[in-house]
Amino acid sequence: MSTTATRARILAEATRQLTELGYAAFTIAGVRDALGLSSGSMFHAFASKPALAAAVYVEGMADYQRAAITAITSADSADAALRAFIAAHLAWIEDHRALARYLFGSLPDEVMAEAARPLAEHNAQFFGVLDALYLRLSRAGLMAALDRSVAQALCIGPAQEYGRQWTRGLASIPPRKLTRALQAAALAALASTSSSTARTRRNTRRTERD
């Protein structure tokens, strides 16, 4: 079996075990034994527990980002792109509930340190697409010009929080059923910044005239 195929098998089994057991109870030995691999094969693919857990995290985030990027870049207008982003976000969470719960969870610093470099490579493309989306929305008059972190909190924050609750069993409505409501919430939140900007400018002009 090729190195690539072995790595894929390890990641699939590690994903299953991490999402079922949690990081604390997860072991490389458990993955090795489930797949019938030698210790050497496991070590060659992933040298440590944090490295394997980080790889699962990065692969999960990359899969989510691919879905979001495809949705955003396939839309023919700013409004449609935002709606597509929210829909893709909710659909991915619903289709990958256990993995989403793992991604939303709090992972040890040692795992995040291992994930930092490969995740940054994926984030570069994803953040570029988000920057283009928010610029498009701003130029369309649907929001003020904002830093990405602020725009992202307003746009995806409600959907992200609902997804977090749903994956933990604290909410019962499947995410897809809330697509329209959360799309409207995102549009309204971003639009509120544009209105605020307009009011500020009007007040400034009045002050200058006075």
List each model region and its residues.
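Amphipathic alpha-helical segments used for helix-helix packing
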Residues: 93-114, 131, 164, 168
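Short, hydrophobic secondary-structure boundary micro-motifs
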Residues: 101-105, 146, 174, 198-199
